[in-house]
Every structure is written in structure tokens, then in C-alpha cells.
Amino acid sequence: MIPGILGTKLGMTQIFDESGLAIPVTVIKAGPCILTQIKTQESDSYQAIQIGFSEVKESSLNKPLLGHLKKSQAPALKHLKEYRVKSVEGLEVAQKITLDSFEVGKTVSVSGKTIGKGFAGTVRRYSFTRGPMTHGSKNHREPGSIGQGSTPGKVHKGKKMAGRLGGKQSTIKNLEIVHVNTDNNILVVKGAVPGKKGNILSIQQEEI
């Protein structure tokens, strides 16, 4: 069983069930991918497969990556992803990976990079409560105290402060598959997934 597949986010829409209830869904163009490497217990001390997605010109990749892909007779692929597996039986290098093993009703975990929001303050980034807006107060959206005095004499690591918001890897678990179109490589899952349209996603099956 293929543990996962790579794809791109096409956008969100809604579908209606038998009772007429509107369900928000995300449409994903998943695959086809190429199996570029098989790792075994004997050669790598663990079992995994590496798949590639999104064919590009050879001039877009560096020579080490092109050499790695040519070992598996794979074309120039922009994105590579590794998945751990319990067994590599029945899998072959250069094998084409599609949505054949994905079934309606099962759940998947979808990983991707969230939309970057740029530099943000603590109110927007961490939902800090703002200060009084009137009665002479000048502390409206300030972070407030960031620590103690001469003891410990430093700001503790991990303190919530202003900084970049978004643009980080995120995973949404237990998203139900509501539709699979193997002919057009379309996967429809219930709910939202990280990122904007065109974002690269990793779709991993819950039960491997």
C-alpha cells in the first residue's frame, strides 16, 4: 500500500450530501508521482520510499539531484518526499504512483506551508488582549512585560513576541476523503488544508 502522494492545492468549494447539507471541501491535484528510491533495512537501516512530483526542465535542477534521479530512470522532478513503510514488497523503482489506493470515507493527513502574513505584532500573532483604549492609557497593542528584573536577568527562550507570522510547515490530520477521480488525478477532502492555491501538499494515509 502506498503511504502517501504529493499534489497541489487547486482551491476550495462546497458539495451537498444526500440531506442537502453543504460540506466545505478542498480540491487537490494529487500525482501522478514517480517512485525514485527504495530504502531497505539492509542498505539504510530503515524502510522507506522516496517519490518525486512535478516534472521540470533539467536545467532547473542541480547536477547532484539530476544524477540521483537518473539512477532510477526518472525524469527531472522538482519535489521529492520520503515516506516510511512497513514493507517494500511489490514496489519498484520508477513505478508510477496514482490515487488507486485512496478510498472514499478514509482519512488522510495533509501537510503544507501556511500562507505567509509577514511581520506581525503579538495581538495578531498570538491573540494577546489589547490594553485600554481611553482614560489616558498609552498601552493599546503593546506586548507588555517580557520577564522579571535582575533575576534571572534575561528573556526566556520561546517568549511570545512580535515576528513573522505564517509561512511555516503545518499538518492537518483526520481529513475525510469525499471524492476520488483517478482518471484526472483529483482528490477531494473535507475541510481546509494549509496554504494558498498552487501550494505543494503531502497527502499521507492514516492507516499504512
UniProtKB/Swiss-Prot annotation:
Keywords: Chloroplast, Plastid, Ribonucleoprotein, Ribosomal protein, RNA-binding, rRNA-binding. Its main location: plastid. This is Large ribosomal subunit protein uL3c. It holds the Pfam family Ribosomal_L3. Disulfide bonds: none annotated. One of its GO terms (biological process) is translation. Belongs to the universal ribosomal protein uL3 family. It is found in: Plastid, Chloroplast. Residues 129-165 are annotated as: Disordered. GO terms for cellular component: chloroplast; cytosolic large ribosomal subunit.
